[in-house]
Amino acid sequence: MPTLPMPTLPVHNVHRRRLPGDLDTVGALIEGLGGADDPIWPAHDWMPLWLDGPMALGTTGGHGPARYRIVSYQPRRLVRFRFHEPSFMIGFHEFSVEPDGPGHTVLQHALTMQLGPVGWPVFPVAFLALHNEVIEMGLDGAERRLTGRVRRPVTGSRLNAARRAVLGRYFEYTGAGPGARRPSTGPAAR
């Protein structure tokens, strides 16, 4: 009897922010991901994004329960992280930049994956709203880094704060190898 393929649920989630600056200026923010002075990821309020080495092909990292490896990297242009945990997330997330007229660049985050059956109820209920909030706060951080302010800052929801409190008990940063780029704030710094 033939084995039927496991059904999956596609997810494609994109966040974009038009920022002042050329490709190199805005693209430099990508280089700081997972570092001590990460200009994008809001590690002070969220489980930090960490990398187990330099920003390079093959470097592993994660945030919260997600674990991934850099599978595509173009300095100051693109970094793509392919998930390997949790197993129900099959795909990647990436940060990229593209020009948007004179003196402006779009910083984009894209999440493209297939959810296995276990992920169907888990991701939309427990993680999607958190994902949207952390990425928008990260884009706020990028805007603040470039301009000194944020025109329309994202306000975190109380429900997401409660979700983070519950999930934070289960998904602490467990440490990486000795060369890990650890954020200066958040659970990893403790």
Q: What name fits each language-model region?
A:
Residues 20-24, 71-76, 96-106:
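A short, structured loop/turn motif at beta-sheet edges
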Residues 26-36, 70, 81, 107-109, ...:
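Hydrophobic pocket/interface hotspot
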Residues 12-14, 63-68, 89-94:
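Short, surface-exposed coil-to-beta transition loops
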Residues 56-59, 63, 128-139, 170-185:
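Low-complexity, charge- and small-residue-enriched intrinsically disordered regions
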Residues 54-62, 80-86:
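Short beta-strand segments that buttress and anchor functional surface loops
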